Amino acid sequence: MKISSAPPEANYTTEGTRTVSNAKISYTLHYEKDSASSGYISETLMNSMEVYVKSIIDHYFITYGFNTPMLRTGDTSYQIYFVPGLNSNGFTRRYSKSSSGEPAGSSICINYPPSINTTDDIKKTIAHEIFHSIQYAYTSQMGFTGNDKWFTEASATYAGLNYVNKYLSYGKSHANKYLVSVETPFTDISNNRSYGMFLFPQYLSQTYGGLNSIKRTLEYVSSGYPVLKSMEKSAQYSDNSATYGEIFAMFQRCNADPRRYVNSNGQYNEATRRLDNVGTASNIPVLSTSAVHYGLKASSTTSAVSVTVNITSGSYTNAIFKLVKFPGDGGSSVYVNYKPTSTSFTIYVSSFKTGTTSSVYPRLTLVASNTSDDYTTSYKFGLTRTNK
């Protein structure tokens, strides 16, 4: 079995290897056997690593049939290196054909020991990194670039969380980084926002066919479509009338009430809202792949409310508004859809009053979403609120 050169992080005193295989793929696991080394992993622990990797590769390549990654030239298996002291839980290193002296393909490094301390944590990390190598299989070994780069961590984070099925334990902090910045386009992946954008692949998955919806998205990417159009076409397998704009707007409806996410247990923060008791606002920009959430709270003197929305620049055809209504008893929110047919329309809500019954709505969130999938088109809107 030929193995290409190890990454520089894999500096073992005494190297051990294990091979894990199924009918589609084979992985060689590398680890430190020297018990005096800080990176030592016992044979008992490596037995567990074998079981974890076998389960994950069966999950991806047998159960769901994802394409296998590119093997490095001359290799007969894929490589995972367990090494200590990394700056993250793990990483996948891509080798392109132009890399100096290195055959194309990828290798994975997992930070173990000591930073990963639980069984689910190590499983999630391995599943996340293997999914990165799967991404390369659909992108001619280039990964996601340009405007689509956000999907790199968003989809891998979702895939890892989906595998361990513990979104809240490991996804909450990531999700909340995105939920405080929904007005910022996907193209801004600073401050690790893209990890929290796993919520968009999660919404697609829980609505349009599970992990297969992500696999179909990658297949369309491989056919030359950008990510957002690929997500639309994937959704159309389940609903042939699905459009990217409505998918994104319903995603933002979930962000207004994250209890709608599977396994969130209502513990994600709601998307950051602008002033809850705004009377008027003007020229609010809504960029492609972003949304603006406005909150409205009833007072003891209100019984209804009307909100007039005006599109002040850009095209109203790029806008969808969702009014999310939260009942007084804390039950499930409901929403009303507004797809503008002109530059101005008015929303009227009765039962906008304080109280603790299901028949009143003491709190509303108006969500303005941008339906454009080109990463560039924007519009601006203003609103005027009148209490009744």
Stretches with model-predicted labels:
Residues 59-81, 141-149, 169-174, 212-220:
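Surface-exposed patches in mature extracellular/periplasmic domains of secreted proteins
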Residues 105-106, 154, 319:
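Repetitive beta-architecture junctions, highlighting loop-to-beta-strand starts
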Residues 120-125, 141-208, 219-258, 263:
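Acidic/His/Gly-enriched intrinsically disordered linker/tail segments
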Residues 223-388:
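Beta/coil-rich, acidic/histidine-enriched accessory regions frequently appended to metallopeptidases
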